[in-house]
């Protein structure tokens, strides 16, 4: 007699298939994430209040780059393209040779992961969707702020360099280090972020800001 219902069995099969597909998507032949060359930008000297005001006003961007996720005994590397318009976004995650890809699109209260035009999954938050389908999650809601070099709403502890760039942040259980910035127009934006939470370590490289 089976102890798993048909619905539970289908749910387990779906999660297993997604995990296999995304593992194939993300795992590459190398185990290190190449960083961009050191920026030669001339940084803007500002007070933190001025810098925070300028960065918080940025609500639209197109960025691309790569990221790595390290867990005990496992390293995942992938490329990404991130389009943000207000609170709506679309993130494409793909392998280095563009053989596999998934798309995550979101707006307040609804996030969808697309594996193909006919196969998609939804949840109310990106963290919930990733936990359901992948078994782990990244703080995508907070990355909306961290990717710009500012804290997300809520309590935090922070350290700054002499230019008042945010260089270290502790928030929502995560430790974030901002090791490189680049100048884009009149603002300085993060180029490399390193996140850690327990045994999970994430490195995000932004190659191009638009």
Swiss-Prot record:
One of its GO terms (cellular component) is cell outer membrane. A lipid is attached at residue 30 (S-diacylglycerol cysteine). Keywords: Cell outer membrane, Chaperone, Lipoprotein, Membrane, Palmitate, Protein transport, Signal, Transport. CDD domains: LolB (cd16326). Its main location: membrane. InterPro entries: LolA/LolB/LppX (IPR029046), OM_lipoprot_LolB (IPR004565). Monomer. This is Outer-membrane lipoprotein LolB. Belongs to the LolB family. A lipid is attached at residue 30 (N-palmitoyl cysteine). It is a lipid-anchor. Plays a critical role in the incorporation of lipoproteins in the outer membrane after they are released by the LolA protein. It is found in: Cell outer membrane. Residues 1-29 form the signal peptide. Pfam families: LolB. Transmembrane segments: none annotated. One of its GO terms (biological process) is protein transport.
């Amino acid at each position: 007699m089976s102890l798993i219902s048909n619905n539970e069995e289908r749910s387990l099969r779906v999660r297993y298939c997604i995990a296999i597909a995304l593992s194939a998507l993300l795992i590459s032949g190398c185990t290190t994430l190449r960083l961009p060359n050191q920026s030669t930008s001339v940084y803007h000297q500002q007070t933190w209040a001025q810098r925070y005001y300028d960065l918080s006003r940025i609500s639209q961007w197109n960025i691309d780059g790569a990221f790595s996720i390290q867990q005990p005994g496992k390293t995942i590397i992938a490329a990404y393209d991130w389009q943000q318009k207000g609170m709506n976004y679309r993130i494409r995650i793909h392998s280095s040779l563009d053989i596999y890809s998934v798309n995550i699109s979101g707006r307040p209260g609804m996030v969808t992961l697309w594996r193909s035009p006919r196969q998609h999954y939804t949840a109310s938050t990106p963290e919930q969707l990733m936990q359901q389908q992948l078994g782990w999650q990244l703080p995508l809601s907070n990355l909306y702020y961290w990717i710009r070099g500012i804290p997300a709403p809520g309590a935090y502890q922070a350290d700054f360099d002499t230019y008042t760039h945010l260089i270290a942040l502790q928030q929502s259980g995560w430790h974030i280090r901002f090791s490189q910035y680049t100048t884009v127009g009149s603002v300085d934006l993060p180029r490399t972020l390193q996140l850690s939470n327990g045994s999970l370590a994430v490195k995000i490289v932004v190659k191009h800001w638009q």
